[in-house]
Structure formats: C-alpha cells, structure tokens
C-alpha cells in the first residue's frame, strides 16, 4: 500500500495543502505546531474515518469555516484508489472511493491500512480503559468491516440510551423504549466483545516476543481482555455472549435509572497488560512509564 499524494482544505491548521510522496520512505519535519501530526492524522483518517485524538469530526475543521476536505491518491491491491472525506459542522460526513459515495466507513476496510504511533499512545499504559478501547477500535476497524458497522450502531444506540436515562423522570414514556434499546445494544455489544477478545488474543501471540527483544530479555509481557463480569468467555460466539450481556444490563437497570448514566455494556470493557508480573503506574517519564494497577 502506497500513499501517492494528499490534498487538504481547511483541515486543522491547513488552509490548503498539496503533497506528493515518495513510494519508499518519507520524512516529515518542521517546527513545533507547524502541522506535522495534523498531516499524519489526515492520512490515517482516510484509513478508518476515525481520528486518534478527536472524538468528533468537527474538531478537525479549521475554526471559522463550515467544512474540511481530505483527499488521498493510494495504490493498493494492485489498483489505484482516490479516497475522499468531506467533513461538515452541521451535517454528516461524506466518504468517497473512486468517485463512489460510501454508505459506511467499513467500506474503507483493507484499502489503506495504517499504523500510527504518537506520544498519545503512551496513554494505553498510563490512562484508563477509554484510551485502550480507542486503540482497539482503530485497529479492528481496518481489518473487519462488520466490526465498524457494529461499533457505529452501538454508539448510535448508546447516545439514545443516554438521553433516555437523562430525561426519563421528566418524560416517563421514555421508559417504554429502554428495554428495546438494551436488547439492540446487547446484540451489537456481543459482536464488539467477540471481536475485541479475538484481537487481543492475536496480539498476545506476537507482542510478548517483540517486548522481550526491546527489553533485552529482562521483561515478559502478557495481555488479557476484560469485559463485564457476567461474560464468562469473551472468545465465545456472539450468541453465547448475548444473554450474558442482557443479564448484566438487568442487574444494573435500577442503578442506571437512579444515576441517569449508562453503567453496562462494552463501553465499560478494557484490557490489561502485565510486564514481568507488574502493572503500570500513573506517573513516570515518557521514556519509561512506572507501574500501577490499570482499570
């Protein structure tokens, strides 16, 4: 896979950019705050339609304008692809591949696979489950289109459920829809748990040897996926996981109503790592994090 060129309009700090890349190795350099990371973020966005540091697409649009544009010319699968993303403040984004509008971001899967490493990746060790879930989502979305579809649907359902829990005391009729949203969230959530658990298992097969080499043979790394307590085997099929997620939802139903917060589901899952029997601590130099239990 080769990124041949990149064009940006009103993306982050770029009013307009046209860049052509060498098919081998490219070194991006410049002053602080000049836009190096923004450029790499744009390339990665064409891979998954997700940003490693922005929760909402509007965060990537330059202040004072209504939309941004990202376009990349890519060589992949022995074919040329033109990938485009149009971001809008007041409307849904639009994704295009070779002039054809894509229905979902999952259709980008496999066209441009990227690996992005940045200082924020240390949050995988130093911070909580949210950073780890973002890492999983970014990686799996490139490999499994069905995962991206399930994740988008789950996030949509989650936003609806949050509004129900927030407003039900002022509008009791909202409670009649809660069970339906719980069922649909459990159905998509079962797929998410299944895919995440299998990804961590594959990571566990290769990451320890790499970590051992980096540490000069002094440390051993192990990874373990954790989900809600009622799921006995996250590697099981989605049909097996579904009733276990429903059980967890039911057990937390009253607590959710009382707190007006969503307390159950894959949104609460994470994964843990151990290095030579210890876990990361919250504060340490960037070169080597210290250790404490991760959530």
Regions found by a protein language model. Name each.
Residues 41, 138, 294:
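Conserved adenine-binding aromatic site and its adjacent loop/helix in ATP-hydrolyzing domains
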Residues 24, 42, 111-113, 135, ...:
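ABC transporter nucleotide-binding domains
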Residues 34, 39, 103, 132, ...:
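Short, electropositive, low-hydrophobicity segments enriched in small/polar residues
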Residues 48-131, 135-147, 204-209, 241, ...:
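Nucleotide-state sensing region of NTPase/ATPase domains
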Residues 123-124, 130-179, 183:
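Long, charged N-terminal accessory/stalk domains
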């Amino acid at each position: 896979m080769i990124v041949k060129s990149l064009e940006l309009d009103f993306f982050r700090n770029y009013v307009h950019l046209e860049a052509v890349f060498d098919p081998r190795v490219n070194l991006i350099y410049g002053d602080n705050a000049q836009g190096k990371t923004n450029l790499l973020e744009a390339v990665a966005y064409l891979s998954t339609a997700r940003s490693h540091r922005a929760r909402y697409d509007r965060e990537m649009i330059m202040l004072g304008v209504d939309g941004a544009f990202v376009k990349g010319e890519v060589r992949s699968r022995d074919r040329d692809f033109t990938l485009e993303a149009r971001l809008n403040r007041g409307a849904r984004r639009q994704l295009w591949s070779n002039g054809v509008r894509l229905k979902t971001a999952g259709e980008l899967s496999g066209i441009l696979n990227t690996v992005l490493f940045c200082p924020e990746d240390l949050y995988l060790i130093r911070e909580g489950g949210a950073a780890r879930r973002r890492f999983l989502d970014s990686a799996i979305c490139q490999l499994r289109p069905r995962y991206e579809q399930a994740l988008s649907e789950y996030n949509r359902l989650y936003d609806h459920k949050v509004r129900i829990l927030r407003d039900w005391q002022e509008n009791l009729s909202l409670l009649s829809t809660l069970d339906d949203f719980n069922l649909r969230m459990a159905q998509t959530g079962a797929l998410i748990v299944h895919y995440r658990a299998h990804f961590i298992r594959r990571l566990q097969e290769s990451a320890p040897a790499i970590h051992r080499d980096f540490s000069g043979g002094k440390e051993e790394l192990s990874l373990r996926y954790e989900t809600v307590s009622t799921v006995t085997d996250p590697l099981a099929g989605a049909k097996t996981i579904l009733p276990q997620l429903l059980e967890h939802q039911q057990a937390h139903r009253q607590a959710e109503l009382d707190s007006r917060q969503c307390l159950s589901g894959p949104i609460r899952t994470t994964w843990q790592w151990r290095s030579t029997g210890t876990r990361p601590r919250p504060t340490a130099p960037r070169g080597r994090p210290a250790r404490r239990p991760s959530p």
